[in-house]
Amino acid sequence: MSKKSTESDAGNTEKQWSLADFEIGRPLGKGKFGRVYLAREAKSKYIVALKVIFKEQIEKYKIHHQLRREMEIQTSLRHPNILRLFGWFHDNERIFLILEYAHGGELYGVLKQNGHLTEQQAATYIASLSQALAYCHGKCVIHRDIKPENLLLDHEGRLKIADFGWSVQSSNKRKTMCGTLDYLAPEMVENRDHDYAVDNWTLGILCYEFLYGNPPFEAESQKDTFKRILKIDLSFPLTPNVSEEAKNLISQLLVKDPSKRLSIEKIMQHPWIVKNADPKGVCASIDI
């Protein structure tokens, strides 16, 4: 990476950022490669999240390519349900990503606190994700790692896709294992070529998890999880009570043949989504 950092935004003006431009606040989270802090741009007082990644960790885990790809992809995307990456800078030891601040934090925390979501909340988030993925797929971006930990909520309860570390910008089929075990599509488990349909599969997994509190193919071991995924060992518990329309959507997404999964467009037109999703994508009543 060059010593200079660029923010190509309105008017294509380039801003050279440094740590002196920010007032650093409380820590927001900690990851494998660094930490995230609440921060405020000193001049404008604009609140952001500052993701700090240690270069030593980048070297240790050999994630140069993955990080560069994440930065390039996320900087280029502009969608209300995708977290903005405003720019980046670095010093001798660290790389700093300047990110949109999502006041509500991780959807994962909300899900664990509440056990599961209501059908209205779940449908709203699946609709928001579908719109964001339709946009990504239109830009030849496959996310490949959508999970509650990678989904943030803003102050209104609007969903934001946050982590593009496993994303890939490609119009061709790919053949690498990535993403999180419980969310992997069968073609990825078998290390077969995969395309945009892996994201459609993940929408089915998430819809199930939103409504029941756990992913559908969860098992004691990785081997057993993979077996359940490949068998499409799908069952719907009696509690909590979930509508047949919701189960219908999930069943049309968790299909082994990628070409037979419900398309993003059809997801957004599904009766359960139309009936339950908030058109503005807001879940103001959710406890964040």
Curated annotation (Swiss-Prot):
Subcellular compartments: Cytoplasm, Perinuclear region; Nucleus; Chromosome; Chromosome, Centromere
Regulation of its function: Inhibited by hesperadin.
Keyword Cytoplasm: yes
Up-regulation conditions: Expression peaks at mitosis.
GO molecular function, one term: histone H3S10 kinase activity
Summary of the tissues where the protein is detected: Abundant in roots, flowers and flower buds, low or absent in expanded leaves, stems and siliques.
Primary location group: cytoplasm
The Protein kinase domain, residue ranges: 22-273
Catalytic residues of the enzyme: 145
Pfam families: Pkinase
Catalyzed reactions: L-seryl-[protein] + ATP = O-phospho-L-seryl-[protein] + ADP + H(+); L-threonyl-[protein] + ATP = O-phospho-L-threonyl-[protein] + ADP + H(+)
UniProt modified residues of type Phosphoserine: 167
Record-listed Phosphothreonine modification sites: 176
GO cellular component: chromosome, centromeric region; nucleus; perinuclear region of cytoplasm; spindle
InterPro entries named among the record's database cross-references: Aur-like, Kinase-like_dom_sf, Prot_kinase_dom, Protein_kinase_ATP_BS, Ser/Thr_kinase_AS
EC number annotated for this UniProt entry: 2.7.11.1
Protein's GO biological process: phosphorylation
Family label: Belongs to the protein kinase superfamily. Ser/Thr protein kinase family. Aurora subfamily.
Miscellaneous remark of the record: Overexpression of AUR3 induces mitotic spindle defects, but the distribution of phosphorylation of histone H3 on the chromosome is not affected.
UniProt-recorded name of the protein: Serine/threonine-protein kinase Aurora-3
Organism encoding this protein: Arabidopsis thaliana (Mouse-ear cress)
